[in-house]
């Protein structure tokens, strides 16, 4: 019984948040489910049918232009982010920089 009230509270809280953001519950698309087994789809799978309200405002690009746009987006994402610290080569580089700084401070004293 407590679980029921908790779920009810959770749903009403979500509805209030959406109303604050300018949405209503009926504006949201239902959660897509995998037709074969009823589970939620993998986050790595692509959405096959985008929502229809977006296609009203935005025309689909021809295939070649869409490919170019995808490549540009991928390219800009790759070049706009610095390499993560957990990359092995970067880890070596950063640790080397740290060691150089430590030794330079020691030798200055």
UniProtKB/Swiss-Prot annotation:
Q: Which GO terms describe its cellular component?
A: mitochondrion
**Which key words are in the record?**
Mitochondrion
Chief location of this protein within or outside the cell = mitochondrion
Please state where this protein is localized. Answer: Mitochondrion
Q: What else is known?
A: A stretch of 270 kb of the mitochondrial genome is duplicated within the centromere of chromosome 2 resulting in the duplication of the gene. The expression of this duplicated gene (At2g07776) is demonstrated.
Protein name according to UniProt: Uncharacterized mitochondrial protein AtMg00530
* Originating species: Arabidopsis thaliana
């Amino acid at each position: 019984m407590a679980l029921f009230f908790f779920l009810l509270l959770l749903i009403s809280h979500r509805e209030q948040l959406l109303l604050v953001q300018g949405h209503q519950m009926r504006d949201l698309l239902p959660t897509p489910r995998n037709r074969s087994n009823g589970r939620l789809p993998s986050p790595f799978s692509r959405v096959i049918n985008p929502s229809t309200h977006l296609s009203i405002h935005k025309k689909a690009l021809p295939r070649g232009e869409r490919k170019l746009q995808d490549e540009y987006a991928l390219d800009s994402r790759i070049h706009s982010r610095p390499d993560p610290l957990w990359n092995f080569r970067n880890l070596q580089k950063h640790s080397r920089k740290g060691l150089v700084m430590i030794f330079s401070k020691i030798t200055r004293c």
